[in-house]
């Protein structure tokens, strides 16, 4: 009995220490959640970083909402997208609504010979914020070998989702480093957090965006550059083919108002509190449950799409 007492005492302190550690960890997590989602960092992004903000894919959805939010904060806006008509319309609306200067650069990011034109268009500008938003996804969930026009689709997905981020960052980052300040927001996706079968190439490109962002932040944070990977779940946009916003599928405007307050607080964010909860649930699910669920969901979307197109 006497020999058991020291062992019991040791186990008591191990248990007490474990409980104290878990309590502190939970308390810190709750504090951080309150700081990020309730308080936010509203003043981090603005003209103090530089006169201009550059937004790729800025004529629709999340990109357009970022451009409007940055203009609202007093930044001049450069929109880079494919359609000159849309660029003109959105830039004029931003100019009139927020009384800021705007510029446009019309390029097709599926091509790889566009970056000299972008370089010329950005020459001489004091760029404080870069939003790498341009992206494309599948027309519908599909098995890899059955993707229509597979070779061309692979090339376009890589050029638009991967090459564009590397090349535009290459053009903008030197000026930020020279001035020792700047923010780069790379729009990834929740599909980049965990593998998404039937969206295989898209999911892989978004995982690249996430890793690229994390690495770039570590390389350049000492130079005053903040790089954030933004990983939203569904947002009501044309790309996502969702028209009506809901609590878990916010409008692009609602999403961006939430996401921009996380800049300076999180280098990796879902951007929206409901999406943060969804991400936490996904991260603790056993992989077999996750894959069974996501395969079932995407198979259902695939079958629905193919049935609809067959009717038409």
From Swiss-Prot:
Question: Which residues are listed as membrane-spanning?
Answer: 4-24, 182-202, 271-291
Q: Where does NADP(+) bind?
A: 50-79
| Pathway assigned to this chain's UniProt record | Lipid metabolism; fatty acid biosynthesis; Steroid biosynthesis; estrogen biosynthesis
- The EC number of this protein is 1.1.1.330, 1.1.1.62
Q: Name one Pfam family in it.
A: adh_short
Q: Which Gene3D superfamilies match?
A: NAD(P)-binding Rossmann-like Domain
Q: Tell where it localizes.
A: Endoplasmic reticulum membrane
Chain location of the short sequence motif Di-lysine motif per the record: 308-312
Reaction catalyzed: a very-long-chain (3R)-3-hydroxyacyl-CoA + NADP(+) = a very-long-chain 3-oxoacyl-CoA + NADPH + H(+); 17beta-estradiol + NAD(+) = estrone + NADH + H(+); 17beta-estradiol + NADP(+) = estrone + NADPH + H(+); 3-oxooctadecanoyl-CoA + NADPH + H(+) = (3R)-hydroxyoctadecanoyl-CoA + NADP(+)
Q: Report residues binding substrate.
A: 189
Report how it sits in the membrane.
Answer: Multi-pass membrane protein
Active site per database record: 202
One annotated GO molecular function: heparin binding
Q: Which family, according to UniProt?
A: Belongs to the short-chain dehydrogenases/reductases (SDR) family. 17-beta-HSD 3 subfamily.
Role this protein plays: Catalyzes the second of the four reactions of the long-chain fatty acids elongation cycle. This endoplasmic reticulum-bound enzymatic process, allows the addition of two carbons to the chain of long- and very long-chain fatty acids/VLCFAs per cycle. This enzyme has a 3-ketoacyl-CoA reductase activity, reducing 3-ketoacyl-CoA to 3-hydroxyacyl-CoA, within each cycle of fatty acid elongation. Thereby, it may participate in the production of VLCFAs of different chain lengths that are involved in multiple biological processes as precursors of membrane lipids and lipid mediators.
Q: Could you tell me what this protein is called?
A: Very-long-chain 3-oxoacyl-CoA reductase
Which organism was this protein described from?
A: Rattus norvegicus
Question: Source gene?
Answer: Hsd17b12
